[in-house]
Amino acid sequence: LYADKIAKDFGFSKDYELVPFKGVYLEYKGNDQFIKRNIYPVPDIRFPFLGVHFTVRVDGKIKIGPTAMPAFWRENYEGFNSFNFKELLETIKWNTLMFIKKSEFRRLAIEEMRKYSKSYLIEQAKMLVYNIPSADLFRWSKPGIRAQLIDKRSLTLIQDFVVEGDEYSVHILNAVSPAFTASFPFARYVVEKYIAKNFYKKEVKDGEV
């Protein structure tokens, strides 16, 4: 959540800013497992979010979500816990600029605000699975915060990996989906391009990290 701040201390992330987005899920509290696998929609390629989908946890619990609502500060998990006035002003600034100047972001923000409604979120989920149990059997679960990088020059959401560094430090500013699936080749890329080149001043042979 603070990768850009740390990078700025080293002279990087000059063109980027991190804007937090809150992801909230609805968790199914019923006893029957009405689905057994994760189910995803076709993503909207204009945005770096997967949309409302079904997740089956390792314990069998079913979740619907997440939302992608702008958070008010970087650790805005619940209420006013970890409130940060400076971050609030920064977040309002960038969200307002994108809302005014970028019609696609404006549509995204309006759509995501509607997902504060449990019934609306479930209606979105019904596009994937029609026979969903009653909304009364779903409860809001703990939220997560997505560290979304934006380009300050173009006011766009960055949808690719962003790495900056030199011989003194390496900064992963944006690690997007599929970050977990791509973790090994991505780690190889970072080691070969930054660590091996700048720290050890030698080439890494193909197939070695």
Model feature map: region roles:
Residues D15-G23, E27-N31, F99-S177:
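Flavin (FAD/FMN) cofactor-binding core of flavoprotein oxidoreductases
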Residues L1-F83:
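Flavin-dependent oxidoreductases
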Residues L1-A3, L121, F186:
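Mid-domain beta-loop-alpha active-site segment that forms a flexible
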Residues H53, E75, V170-E192:
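A conserved FAD-binding loop/helix module that cradles the flavin
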Residues A7-F10, P185-K201:
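Internal hydrophobic alpha-helix adjacent to the cofactor/substrate pocket in enzyme cavities
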Residues D59-W73, G79-Y130:
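Residue-level recognition of phosphate/Mg2+-coordinating polar/acidic sites
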